[in-house]
Amino acid sequence: DKDKEISLSEVKALGEDFELGEEYSDKVDFLKFGRRAILNLRQILASKILELQKDALYAKYSEKVGQIITGEVYQTWKKEVLLLDDEGNEMLLPKQEQIPSDFYRKGEMVRAVVLRVDNLNNNPKIILSRTSNLFLQRLFEIEVPEINDGLITIKAIARIPGERAKVAVESYDDRIDPVGACVGMQGARIHGIVRELGHENIDVI
């Protein structure tokens, strides 16, 4: 390939001391190219950069599936809400993944779990959820250190988003009351979760 390779004899003719297989670079004078060629090159480079950015975004959020993230409401539509992360990347919260009592205003910060990342024609689409059981589980992991530390295990979750939920927990340490630890003193731990979920009635059993 003459655009990617150069023969050893050609390099030596230029007075360069290179061995077979080594990389050789040469300065390109863009003034020798026409305007059309330069514009074409610019377009190709912009396209490649955009492609790499999309690949990086897909890889980044594929690793975040199942994690809670916070986004800023940018635009609300009838069927979905558009949020932006702290780098300006777009994320979608579909209507069916919203708690019925949720009401979003532009500029408001919203927490949700990354449900999945679609990749249609190399266009990453980050889908969020607030109705997923996993969202409730992650909230408990944040509010209850014993769950995050593995001292308490969430065995099952049943939920009608925005209305009620049952969370079954257990501990292998007899010194820990799993229900009491999840609820907290005077309900301090569970109240934050209840507020986040639009006052969903949560029973811990």
PLM segments and residue spans:
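RNA-contacting regions in translation and RNA-metabolism proteins
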Residues: 1-205
